[in-house]
UniProtKB/Swiss-Prot annotation:
Pfam families: Tas3-like_N, Tas3_C-hel. The keyword Heme does not apply. Residues 328-361, 403-416 have a biased composition (Basic and acidic residues). GO terms for molecular function: molecular adaptor activity; siRNA binding. Its main location: nucleus. This is RNA-induced transcriptional silencing complex protein tas3. InterPro entries: Tas3_C.
Length: 549
């Protein structure tokens, strides 16, 4: 195989179907899709032809594949320039890539160079498609690109499709002017410079306007020529307007300047500077706590001993809300105001919702006599409450019993349960671990790794990162395969066999596809034998089918 062909094969657009490149996911990337379809057509035509006895066709196919790669790269550069939302108003070739809900219309281009005479491509002529033989020689297409999609809104613009000159009968292609990319780059650079200079002017302004005046290094002119930019977000002030209508902060040197008496934080008349409503006022806080307790009829709730020793059920909300209110009061002094207390009392004493029902039950418990507390079974609580001390003793005994039970359960726990403690949170963790170990064991069982010490060393270093989910299995394959040094080598591997390998790879399962795409890099980069690569791909496919069963 020729050296010129071999260096292009590893990165052909055909491989983009195997590897999930982000730029091939979106439907808006029409040029990449067209190029990939073109490469598929070329390979299909190649398989249909008998190229073993026709070496000249093989050379033509390789040249066409190289062209498809350069064409796709050029189209991506064009899309990157056209998708830039800010273009010059008077640019020689102005285009927008707009997308509608109806979908993206595909545009099929004619063959450019050295394609087979059996393939026909439709040629767009005045809205009609005519089959044209693609045996024509392609001109120099360094500056010829696929043009962005035109929608119904841009009918007044000149169509960028290929057309036939009726007067001369020759095919002319409207090419993308070289000055377009230069003008777009120049406009973007000027825009970034103007923005940076404008920011510096704002920081160091003494008496200038905060808005974007006419002396702002041309940002106003450039903003008028933008297509997609909404300039309403910028506050523009007319420099020629009457000074009395300008804002007051315009004359300030800076809002946070230390010499500005109006912006000094130490001269506040009210707010944080007041000492009457200091946060350290404990009388107001104590009064507020008592008032809140009285609002829900908890007379004895404020005693610290009972509050600390009170064994709260899991679903209680009384003590939780009280702690929340105390924490809130410590950070928000305004919450002690009468209006805030009235709102909270209204919230705590309202008649709807599960919170009000719980408060009613709590007030019932604390306000009834000892004989009446035995009727708690009607509310769902099947235990007897004595006085406060008995209740605290019962709570502590329950705590002790719970701790003893936890300690006994930990002592009687099996070691296997400790190792698999995290599996209870994720039921699929054990299954995923077993599956991953199956893949790793499959890699270790390959003769390729057993006879290659460098691959084994790389695998040992990579496995910890793989178990920590820092890399996926395809990355493990790429790292391990790239570390190989000794493997079956075959020089001048024929192109048809490589194409058949890629065609078979595209039909495989995800695991086998990842293995095949990783091993194919060794085929093109280090002349790995295609037979050996096909054998590894076959073993990966067998393992995947067994795993599915």
């Amino acid at each position: 195989m020729e050296k010129g062909i071999k260096k292009y094969l590893p990165s052909l657009p055909f491989l983009a179907c195997i590897s999930d490149f982000p730029e091939n996911h979106g439907t808006s990337r029409r040029s990449a899709t067209v190029s990939l379809e073109r490469v598929h057509e070329l390979f299909t035509e190649h398989w249909l032809s008998n190229l073993k006895n026709r070496r000249e066709k093989r050379q033509e196919l390789a040249e066409e594949a190289v062209y498809c790669r350069s064409e796709m790269l050029s189209q991506r550069k064009l899309l990157a320039a056209v998708d830039f939302p800010q273009q010059l108003k008077n640019s020689p070739a102005k285009a927008k890539a707009t997308h509608t809900s109806s979908g993206v219309t595909k545009e099929v281009r004619a063959s450019k160079k050295y394609t087979s005479s059996n393939v026909e491509f439709p040629l767009v002529t005045d809205g009609k498609e005519k089959p044209v033989k693609s045996k024509q020689l392609r001109k120099n297409s360094v500056t010829e690109f696929e043009k962005p999609i035109e929608t119904k809104k841009s009918k007044h613009r000149k169509s960028r499709n290929k057309f036939l000159d009726k007067s001369s009968g020759s095919m002319e292609i409207e090419s993308w002017d070289n000055s377009t990319s230069d003008s777009i780059i120049e406009s973007s650079s000027r825009l970034h410079e103007s923005i940076s200079l404008r920011e510096n002017d704002i920081r160091s302004s003494d008496s200038k306007s905060v808005g974007w005046d006419d002396n702002s290094t041309g940002f106003r002119e450039s903003s008028k020529s933008l297509d997609h930019t909404d300039t309403s977000m910028f506050m523009e002030l007319d420099s020629n307007s009457d000074p009395q209508f300008r804002p007051k902060y315009q004359a300030k040197s800076s809002w946070f300047a230390p010499d500005d008496p109006e912006a000094s934080w130490g001269n506040l008349d009210d707010g944080w500077g007041e000492t009457n409503g200091s946060w350290s006022s404990t009388d107001d806080t104590k009064h507020y706590k008592n008032e809140w307790a009285e609002s829900i009829n908890l007379d004895n709730f404020n005693r610290p001993s009972q509050q600390e020793d009170y064994d709260k059920p899991k679903n209680t909300q009384v003590s939780r809300s009280s702690n929340h209110h105390r924490r809130y009061d410590s950070y928000h002094p305004d919450s002690r105001s009468d209006s805030y207390r009235s709102k909270r009392e209204h919230y705590d004493n309202r008649d709807t919702g599960p919170r009000s029902k719980h408060l009613e039950k709590s007030s019932y418990v604390y306000n009834q006599n000892f004989e009446d507390r035995t009727h708690l079974s009607d509310h769902g609580a099947h235990f007897h409450l004595g006085n406060a001390n008995d209740f605290n003793m019962q709570g502590s005994s329950r705590k002790r019993k719970a701790s003893d039970r936890q300690r006994e359960s930990r002592e009687n726990e099996l070691p296997t349960k400790k190792l698999n403690a995290s599996d209870s949170h994720n039921p699929l963790a054990s299954l995923t671990t077993d599956k991953n170990d199956l893949y790793i064991n499959w890699l270790k069982s390959l003769s390729f790794f057993q006879t290659n010490s460098s691959c084994a060393e790389a695998l040992v270093k990579v496995i910890p990162h793989y178990h920590n989910k820092l890399i996926d299995f395809s990355q493990v394959l790429q790292l391990v395969f790239s570390a190989s040094e000794k493997f079956p080598i075959q020089e001048n591997q024929p192109l048809p066999e490589q194409l058949m390998f890629l065609s078979n790879l595209e039909k495989q399962t995800p695991f086998a596809k990842a293995v095949g795409s990783s091993i194919y890099k060794l085929v093109t980069g280090k002349n790995l034998s295609l037979d050996f690569a096909s054998q590894i791909l076959k073993e990966a496919s067998i393992l995947e089918h067994k795993n599915e069963k």
